[in-house]
From Swiss-Prot:
Record-given protein name: Ribosomal RNA large subunit methyltransferase H
Entry superkingdom: Bacteria
Residues bound to S-adenosyl-L-methionine: 77, 109, 128-133
Source species of the chain: Oenococcus oeni (strain ATCC BAA-331 / PSU-1)
Gene Ontology molecular function: any one: rRNA (pseudouridine-N3-)-methyltransferase activity
A Pfam cross-reference name: SPOUT_MTase
């Protein structure tokens, strides 16, 4: 069975995001082993300098990299990533195991995004649009899209 891990910076604080996330995680359990791995976020000063922001990105990126295994297929969610559709993601999720991978790691950054180290480690960078999303909402959106991918791949009418 395919393992999917969603690596994220920070925790979900709002109950409504948690409830939505839990609903999709429950639905996904019949298709895949899925887990969310949270790493500590760094406090970002309101008027942080470029170097302070870079240091925060590198610290958070290091925490994420520590959780990624060498044999995992890594997909970074990045605003500059390839714009994809739901069927595109479904194709990726179906095809990645055919290349010998048993684990897909989706990575969502914190308020400053992802470090270059994470982007360089990623096997693919994808984007759901050129907008900035709160990482809590991005987590729910990604989880729903992963569920939608499995439904597309089994030919379910959910996608319509």
């Amino acid at each position: 069975m395919l393992n999917i891990r969603i690596l994220v910076v920070g925790k979900i604080k709002e109950k409504y995001f948690r409830n939505a996330l839990d609903q999709y995680l429950k639905r996904l359990s019949r298709f895949t082993k899925i887990e969310i791995i949270e790493v500590k976020d760094e406090a970002t000063p309101e008027k942080a300098s470029k170097s302070e922001n870079l240091e925060i990105l590198q610290t958070e990126g290091g925490r994420l990299l520590d959780k990624i295994n060498n044999r995992d297929f890594v997909i970074a969610l990045a605003i500059e990533g390839k714009l994809i559709t739901s069927p595109d993601l479904a194709d990726m999720i179906r095809e990645i195991p055919l290349d010998g991978y048993s684990t897909i790691d989706f990575v969502i950054g914190g308020s400053l995004g992802l470090s270059n180290e994470i982007k360089n480690r990623a096997n693919a960078k994808i984007s759901f649009g050129r907008i900035t999303l709160p990482h809590q909402l991005a987590r729910v959106l990604l989880t729903e899209q992963i569920y939608r991918s499995f439904m597309i791949n089994e030919g379910s009418p959910y996608h319509k």
